[in-house]
Amino acid sequence: MATTKLGFIVQRTPYKSENTKLALTHAISSQSVEVYLNDGDLVTADIAFVGDGVLNCLKNQKAMEKYGLTSTESHIKNCLLLDLNVMVCKEDLDKFGLSENDIVMDAEEFGADMTVKVVPFSEITKMMEDVNHLLFF
């Protein structure tokens, strides 16, 4: 029984490129590989938003209206629905003058039990040290 831990670090602003959506899509799809794993093997995914990447977590995004795209907000909620660990760097939120009230914190309307965790960068660093594969977007 082995667990492969994946870490996704999102550090770029939303909608300027596909990086953020790729990170979230890969994290979500990592949960569907169980059909290819041996019994008892697992793949887990942690996602951390740091630097400019915390702007991806803003509430009430109007991506469909402005760009004709699904919002990053809905992708984050899908991650929570799949019980993925989603973290946002507290120091970077503070840098932008944002708080938990400004960002997506849950996906209750989807039936998700998980919530976004606002954490110090030291906790994100620990996650980066603990994963088997670390991907930057």
Regions found by a protein language model. Give the residues of each.
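Short hydrophobic/aromatic patches at helix-to-coil boundaries
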Residues: 15, 134-137
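Short internal beta-strands
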Residues: 44-52, 86-92
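Histidine-anchored nucleotide/phosphate-binding helix
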Residues: 19-40, 47
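Low-complexity intrinsically disordered segments
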Residues: 94, 108-132
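Short, glycine-rich nucleotide/cofactor-binding loops
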Residues: 8-24, 57-66
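Extreme N-terminal starter segment of soluble prokaryotic enzymes
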Residues: 2-7
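A glycine-rich helix N-cap at a beta->alpha junction
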Residues: 63-93
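Short, hinge-like loop/turn segments at secondary-structure boundaries
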Residues: 64-66, 103-107
